Each structure stands twice: as C-alpha cells, then as structure tokens.
C-alpha cells in the first residue's frame, strides 16, 4: 500500500507447538535464534516487518532469567527501528488455546510480565484496544511517518 513493502515474521513457536514439539518451549535461546533469523533475512528486503512475536518475548519467557540472553535480545532488538504496540485483550473475544502452551490466566500473566519488562528496560510502546479499522489506520500513519512517506 502506498509504495511500502512489508512482510510478516510468523511466530515460530506456534508452528512447533502444532507439531507437538513441546520441549522446544524450554529453549528460549533456540527460539530467539529462529525468530531473529527471520527478521535478519527480511530486514534488507522490505520496508516494514510485521510480527506478533517480537524477539523481546524470548526474554519474557526465559525461565532461566539469563542476563546474557537478555542482553543479546535487547541488543538485537535495538538494531531495528521498532514500533511496538500492545493489543489489549477484548474480554468478549474467546481465548484460542490452539497453538499456545498457556491458558488464558497464563497468557494474562505473560501480558503483565511483558509490561513490566518493557517498563524496566525503558522500551517505548503504545497500547491499543483491538486491531480494528481505527487502530490499523493509526498504525499505518505512524509507519508512514517513520518512513517519511
């Protein structure tokens, strides 16, 4: 749209969970590498990469709380010119368990952990309610402004 090229970096873990590869959840280093490689291969090919699984989540999900992994993730994240949006959960929408390894309460706990992580690391983000038309237009305008288009 309007001369902006984009692609989607799909959530790698979701594919693995559909394959019943549950053990992979325990290795955030592996998952980070897979997700980061997708971004790396796309970054020079398109203007915009859209993802529902930013690499920051690997630090949020890292049960070992490894400071070296966190530093690496933040370093890689900061190599990109990011716009980060947190989409608030709509209580009227049923939570889909398929392709996820936590239930709704677990997902809400991750939401809170993510917000704390972003705050602790002074990472800018915007919160939006849903991904409907108005919010899509807002995001698109912000992308255009960032790209000077």
Regions flagged by a language model, labelled:
Residues 16-19, 65, 140:
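Anionic, Ser/Thr-rich low-complexity intrinsically disordered regions
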Residues 7, 48, 84:
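Hydrophobic "anchor" residues on beta-strands that sit immediately upstream
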